[in-house]
Curated annotation (Swiss-Prot):
Main location: membrane
HAMAP family: ATP_synth_alpha_bact (MF_01346)
Keywords: ATP synthesis, ATP-binding, Cell inner membrane, Cell membrane, CF(1), Hydrogen ion transport, Ion transport, Membrane, Nucleotide-binding, Translocase, Transport
Protein name: ATP synthase subunit alpha 1
NCBIfam families, A to Z: atpA, PRK13343.1
Amino acid sequence: MQLNSTEISDLIKQRIESFDVVSEARNEGTIVSVSDGIIRIHGLADVMQGEMIELPGGRYALALNLERDSVGAVVMGPYANLKEGMKVTGTGRILEVPVGPELLGRVVNTLGEPIDGKGPIEAKLTSPVEVIAPGVIARKSVDQPVQTGYKSVDSMIPIGRGQRELVIGDRQTGKTAMAIDAIINQKDSGIFSIYVAIGQKASTIANVVRKLEEHGALANTIVVVASASESAALQYLAPYAGCAMGEYFRDRGEDALIVYDDLSKQAVAYRQISLLLKRPPGREAFPGDVFYLHSRLLERAARVNEEYVERFTNGEVKGKTGSLTALPIIETQAGDVSAFVPTNVISITDGQIFLQTELFNAGVRPAVDPGISVSRVGGSAQTKIIKKLSGGIRTALAQYRELAAFAQFSSDLDEATKKQLDHGQKVTELMKQKQYAPMSVFDQALVIFAAERGYLADVELNKLLDFEAALLSYARGQYAEFAAEIDKTGAYNDEVEAQLKKLTDDFVATQTW
């Protein structure tokens, strides 16, 4: 068979055109050192701060230090089989986590992967963990309440939707218990909850999940876990991942509550990473940007206006405001709120609930110290009936503390002082509350009404909690419609006051406690 030169050249041309070759530019580097979860990479020229770097075996590292001739990255997960000389690739992507209603009722790790054994999560959307907080114009003032179910908190230190309220205290003072009760109280309120566990024992987290399930609150809660056994990188990133999941609801006109338990451990994890990256240490060996670590996280908790929600959803959701309320927890050492991280977070948040060891050990639980606990914006969001009735509670407790200290030095007290001491003692007793027993608006209002109108004067101190239980049981039995109406509206007027007075008078007449 004879082929002429034209046919040969056509054949070669055809073969060349049909040859399947794809050229792609890859941003590659080489690991030059591995130590304590930190890798140094040479040759990654085109990499951005916070970029995901793909490692052999399908794992990832996070680029944190961009230096002249190397990149310092922190490995997210185990790093035992990483070796010098291994090739790594820049992905050009920032860390993203799955978000959406599909995560409700699930326990996930920092990367949004399920760890509860209930199968995969079919989330349709992902969101970057680092997002710039809404600007001033996009925000709306806080004027709707988040009921925690605690008499002492809802009456004296009210929390509003979109607020950041710090829960601070020593270890074993009931900080987690307060946050979990606040989540349990949201199960019928339409507020979604996210609980972020940072650096805690796995057994403690399992107990929290079990309690949420027992009380029917897990179905509208996402639990994000970075336990004590996880790497420092995952503990540092967990709050941002949880916040991204909460922002999904905020930006679509829903309300969400997020608990960070606790940010002290996140700061310690970040300190560990920073020191290993050879960043210069500052006060208490924390890096210079530890304030920014918490401020950029907590500023993302906000109440956003209707225009923001409408713009974000491309007009699908109209006339609805969204909110993300944050309850960060900080653990103090021996009650020292003037340490570096506590003062930082106090200055960032809109108030703090200080839990005191002495009160906790004295049986006052929740151990809220009304002296230094404050809510800077929650007053305007407080339920009307609680706001009208609870004005004297904080004053009574503050005066009682002062007089109790004074009374230790004096035996002969005048009648007015004795009366004040007795009232303060009874209000302190009345503020006690069992765990996993959040109270409705009506129950709180009725108890505070009884305290403020002098109905406790003839009740012995050791019978006070029996009096409270019997009063609430009587009210729910005899005045069920009235109770349901107050729970729904939270309204207060002369008619409501007269009804509360009649109810309490009727109960006192029965003498059944």
